Every structure is written in C-alpha cells, then in structure tokens.
Design a protein with these regions (language model features):
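Aliphatic-rich helix starts adjacent to a transmembrane/signal segment
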Residues: 2-67, 71, 75
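Intrinsic low-complexity, intrinsically disordered segments enriched in polar/basic residues
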Residues: 2-3, 64, 88, 178-179, ...
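Intrinsically disordered regulatory regions flanking bHLH/HLH domains
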Residues: 53, 100-101, 114
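Short, conserved loop/turn and helix-capping segments at secondary-structure boundaries
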Residues: 56, 60, 87, 91, ...
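Short, glycine/small-hydrophobic-rich surface segments
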Residues: 72-109
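Intrinsically disordered, low-complexity regions enriched in Pro/Ser/Thr/Gly and acidic residues
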Residues: 104-106, 110-264, 268-276
Length: 276
C-alpha cells in the first residue's frame, strides 16, 4: 500500500489592495503635477529672460544712436518751443495737439545736427554736408501699427497686450543751404518749415508717461547755448507685457516711477557756434 504524498501548501501571491492602488495613483499624480509645474515655471523664466535680453539689447542700440547724434548737435531747441512736424500718423502726438519741447506727457527732443562735411558742399544729393533737423518723440503703438500699413518696414506688428506702449520715433529733415543757419532762422523754422517728412521707428515698447516718472527728455531753458554748459538728460525706460507679467529695462526694484530710469546726461559739443 502506497503512502499518499503530503499535500503542498497553497501558494500565496502578493496583491495590492484598492487603498494601496489609490495611494499609488495619488502619489504619481502629485509627482507629475510637481514636474509639470517645474517645467512650466522654467519655461516662463526662460521666456521672461529672453524678452528682457531683447529689450535690453534694443534699448542700448537705440540709446547709443540717439546719444551719438545728440553729441553732434549745433543747436538744441529749448523748452517752450512749438514744433510743426505735419499731421501724418508717424508724427502724431500722444493725446493730440502740437508738439511742445519740455512737455512731460508727450516729450520731444529737437536738435540741429552739424554736418560731417563742409556746409559749402550741401545739396539735395550731398546731405552729409548739410545741417540736419532731427526730432525724437513718442507715438502710441496702436496708432502707429494701424496707420503705417502692414507691409511697411516701419511696422513692428500688432501686440494686443501692449497697444498703449510708446514707440520712439526719429524724424529727419535736411536743411539744404550752403551756409550755416542762424539761430533766428532755426527758430523761425519751428512753426512752419520743418514738416514734409515721415518719422522712422527707432525703438519699440517705450514706457509711456505716468505720474512720478521723469520725462523722457529734459532740455535746457531758452537762452545762449555753449559747449560744456548746455546739457540734455535722456531718461529712457522700456517695458513690455509678456505672459501676464511686466518685463522692464532697467529692472524695477520699486513701485516708485522715479526709480524706473537710469538718466544719461549728454553735453552737445557743437553748440554755441551758430550766429544769432
């Protein structure tokens, strides 16, 4: 008679309970959410940094160009001067009305730049020998974009988040004459003889005027001008709304608009040489 083999014990297999599965799923979701938040935050930080770098580079280029022209000025139109630059969209003053040097709400810098070559050779085909009237002023971004035409090289493109931002514009008119202008002639040109040209886009996303913000340009009062004594202050600040945040250059360490600029003081080297 054979002895039956002893029965093998039943093999137990490990299994997750419903509660354990729910806990595991919850932990996985938490980890996924944290990783997603980190990725989004990193992406936004990278985007903000790119916007800031772009603003900084464009501001520096425009500011250096403006300052280089200002240093060569033979005359700076003083506070209180009314300028007629025409009625086109590229010369449209924020808020309307006439351009007045010294305005804080719609600032304008107007100069006459000395020629690179002897003025005796000035002609329509040789403008390097001509004195040049130059003005720098803001135009509301939405006004400019809608008015210059989509195909224009001067059109930076629509940006609904920044429609009220300013563009900094350069306006140039050659003074075609073979002798240096007098101060009286330049003064007489201001209300009637400087229109007929179009402004060119110099810088995008310029900070509009707000209470407490230093004016974009601070120019001398009326009176004799002399090299080393006549000075102009440029208070250039740029800001852009991007991804729900304001990115500004210079960076804003305070909510006080008085701290939003880094003033640059410029002394034109050719003033005082023109006869009254």
């Amino acid at each position: 008679m054979t002895t039956p083999l002893p029965a093998k014990p039943a093999r137990q297999t490990a299994a997750f309970t419903l509660i354990e599965l729910l806990v595991a799923v919850a932990l996985a979701l938490i980890i996924l959410f944290a990783a997603s938040s980190l990725l989004i935050s990193s992406s936004r930080s990278s985007s903000d940094l790119q916007v800031r770098n772009d603003l900084l580079q464009e501001q520096q280029i425009a500011q250096n160009y403006l300052i280089a022209n200002l240093r060569e000025a033979a005359y700076v139109y003083p506070q209180g001067t009314t300028l007629n630059l025409g009625s086109g969209v590229t010369t449209q003053r924020p808020g309307g009305g006439a351009w007045v040097v010294g305005s804080s709400t719609a600032p304008i810098l107007a100069i006459v730049k000395a020629p690179e070559l002897p003025v005796s050779g000035c002609s329509a085909s040789n403008d390097r020998a001509c004195y040049k009237f130059k003005a720098y002023y803001p135009v509301v971004r939405a006004t400019w974009v809608s008015g210059v035409g989509a195909a224009s090289q001067n059109n930076p493109g629509a940006d609904p988040s920044n429609e009220t931002s300013w563009l900094l514009v350069e306006y140039t008119k050659n003074l075609v004459q073979t002798t240096p202008p007098t101060i009286t002639q330049l003064t007489d040109l201001a209300p009637v003889g400087l229109n007929g040209e179009s402004g060119k886009l110099l810088l995008d996303y310029v900070q509009p005027a707000v209470t407490g913000l230093p004016p974009l340009f601070e120019v001398p009062a009326a009176g004799p001008q002399a090299a080393g004594q006549t000075r102009v202050t440029v208070n250039l600040s740029v800001s852009r709304a991007a991804s729900g945040k304001i990115v500004a250059v210079p960076a804003r360490a305070s909510t006080d608009p008085a701290t939003w600029v880094q003033p640059v003081l410029v002394a034109p080297r050719n003033v005082g040489r023109l006869t009254p």
